[in-house]
Amino acid sequence: MSLKYYLNDLSDSDSESESECAEGSSPQDEQNGFYDYRSPPDSADTSIFEDTGRSSSERPMSPTEVCSTDFEEKVPFSSELVVIPESMLKKREEYGRFFSNFKKAIYHLPADEEEWDRQERLHQSFIEMFGRKYPPELSEILKSDEYYEKRCLDLGCGTGCWIKEVARDFPYCEAVGVDLVVVPDTRDFPPNLRCEMDDVNLGLQHFFGRFDVVHARLLSSGIKDYQLLIENIARTLRPGGLVELQEYDFHIYDCNRRRFELSTNELAPPWWPRWMTFFNEAIRKMQGDVDAATHLLKWVRTHPGFEQVRYEERWIPIIPGNLDPLEPMYARLQADVSVYLRSGRPLLLKSGLSEMEVDILENNAIREFYESETTQYTRLQCVCARRNNAVLDHLPPSYNFR
């Protein structure tokens, strides 16, 4: 079985089955560990068309495939149909959870049913938290009566929940999602939505100058250099385009909104901040940019390519303590943190903690959620900005990771 999908890198090559190149790729492709989605195999599998009795050019497109004959004029950077070998669709199993098979991936939360369900619920909570799906400017930017005149890019799209909303609400735009794994369920994808399988740490050069909106939410744990990501986004946006960035800072705050400053030298209360301290350190070991949220506003505000910079933050009382009864949305977020603890467990174990140590952190944090009388906050920091007309220098060759 092969899935029609965009592919920008190969899986980890630790085993023979995992290191197979797509059929038709050259030995040099295999050596470089990179399969360019703009250079498809000559012998692409078209068996999915056989039951229709129609050629691929006659058959309606599915959301996860694309042919240049259908899109070459509407989407200049689209390419031939690419077939991903079954080995690329496999996931790595670690500590009972499943993960992206991308080599050297920094992001280390699971890609399985439990985590996808959490992401879907979190998306709905974000809508309630902000009272809107999108920044106010987005509607005006994406409004068009011409197919694919406007384009929207979602980096780290996960289940595709945000980019699906965009594709439905703006049916004339082209919506593109990028993630380390294949989107789990594409059956309800609108026809103007497609996805790419890629690691954004490798750069966005193939997108430069082609999008009107770029959205990135909760990516920092999987990004090696977030400031460099902003450089890439600035070059991806067209003049007048919009960027929206939303990140947590991987710290917990007390009832006075002061940061807990704890160490990983002991297992002691407060437990939720202690768990987050260990998690913060584990992400650092994987080279994730855990400090990105703290610097988002400065990085965007001082960038020569952006203007009309706007900052918002939300203080989320994950542990309500003595606060008045929470809105249902915050209660759901609190419940979802228990799922988040389980999702973070493999990374804590990978960082060197024992099963017993992780159990102590996790069980006491959950107890603290429901028994503590002291309010504890998580801080969400958000930056929106418009792309101005400034012509930016090319990124140095050292930034071309591919």
Swiss-Prot record:
GO terms for cellular component: nucleus. Induction: Moderately expressed during the development but expression is induceded in the mycelium stage. CDD domains: AdoMet_MTases. It catalyses: L-methionyl-[protein] + S-adenosyl-L-methionine = S-methyl-L-methionyl-[protein] + S-adenosyl-L-homocysteine. Residues 1-70 are annotated as: Disordered. Its EC number is 2.1.1.-. Disruption phenotype: Leads to the production of coprinoferrin. It is an enzyme of class 2 (transferase). It is found in: Nucleus. GO terms for molecular function: methyltransferase activity. It comes from the Eukaryota. The lineage of its organism: Eukaryota, Fungi, Dikarya, Basidiomycota, Agaricomycotina. Belongs to the methyltransferase superfamily. LaeA methyltransferase family. Residues 11-21 have a biased composition (Acidic residues). GO terms for biological process: methylation; sporulation resulting in formation of a cellular spore. Methyltransferase that performs automethylation. No other methyl-accepting substrate has been identified yet. Acts as a global regulator for secondary metabolite gene expression. Negatively regulates the production of coprinoferrin, a structurally novel acylated tripeptide hydroxamate siderophore. Its main location: nucleus. Keywords: Methyltransferase, Nucleus, S-adenosyl-L-methionine, Sporulation, Transcription, Transcription regulation, Transferase. This is Secondary metabolism regulator laeA. Pfam families: Methyltransf_23.
